């Protein structure tokens, strides 16, 4: 797994832990730093900060374009993978759009249900097509 792939996985873990424990993502990241001697990859921090800062907008896009699904009905892991993928797709110009989608699908293949990769691919693919109008 690439360094950025590992950073995405760690960001997923931090955001998932924060959601499950009802704490801020920054508190979850701080707790992780204190529990281990491992240095948190700067890209993990960038993802967490980006997702947190744009979460309301990202959630609105996901809610609008997830046909037949509410955010609350989605498995937590899928919801967080979608947030990470949407942030990379829409707000991180360093990551090509196709890479943002494929990396989110790869995370879903290893971290979620058998049905999740197709769902995540479809929803992020839709956001990718609509990107110019979403960011206008």
Curated annotation (Swiss-Prot):
One of its GO terms (cellular component) is cytosol. One of its GO terms (biological process) is transcription antitermination. It comes from the Bacteria. Keywords: RNA-binding, Transcription, Transcription antitermination, Transcription regulation. GO terms for molecular function: RNA binding. Gene3D superfamilies: NusB-like. This is Transcription antitermination protein NusB. It comes from Paenarthrobacter aurescens (strain TC1).
